[in-house]
Amino acid sequence: MSQPAKVLLLYAHPESQDSVANRVLLKPATQLSNVTVHDLYAHYPDFFIDIPREQALLREHEVIVFQHPLYTYSCPALLKEWLDRVLSRGFASGPGGNQLAGKYWRNVITTGEPESAYRYDALNRYPMSDVLRPFELAAGMCRMHWLSPIIIYWARRQSAKELASHARAYGDWLANPLSPGGR
């Protein structure tokens, strides 16, 4: 039996202590030997990112997961800084920038609104696929395989039972993310 893919879970939430949904989602990940949970706000509260260290972590893993809340149709500021600095030209893109080619990218996102708010005729005016397009484009720029995002809509309003169900499914996927049904 082959080993499961090594997963780097980049977690970015500036108020993690207040996010019940994200804490529940993280729990199964912390119990899996093939998953490295890397809390960006815990490591870089001053936003001074150790770029060589982050790039080394990326090289060591096959699947990169970005878990974060949706903030103003994007990600928290530190994750945006991380993306801009770590996925640099010559490392992840451009001439010689093939360090992430063939790896897998997946966003795992919590939102404050229901799924129905993400439509052309609704509150947010665009479907989630449009909102997340910059992440998909970044994955393509890095020559990574884009995996459909996991989205927990209206995260604060999910019951404990619903969150536990999401966490189980997420944990099952993390345990073997590249299995035939996992992509």
Swiss-Prot record:
Look up and give the membrane topology term. Peripheral membrane protein
Q: Where in the cell is it found?
A: Cell inner membrane
What is any one of the record's Gene Ontology cellular component terms?
plasma membrane
Q: Which reaction does it catalyse?
A: a quinone + NADH + H(+) = a quinol + NAD(+); a quinone + NADPH + H(+) = a quinol + NADP(+)
Q: Which Gene3D superfamilies match?
A: 3.40.50.360
- Specify where it is mainly localized: membrane
Q: What class of enzyme is it?
A: oxidoreductase
**Protein family according to the UniProt entry:** Belongs to the NAD(P)H dehydrogenase (quinone) family. KefG subfamily.
Name of this protein: Glutathione-regulated potassium-efflux system ancillary protein KefG
Organism expressing this protein natively? Shigella flexneri
Which lineage do the record's taxonomy fields give for this organism?
Bacteria, Pseudomonadati, Pseudomonadota, Gammaproteobacteria, Enterobacterales
Primary gene name: kefG
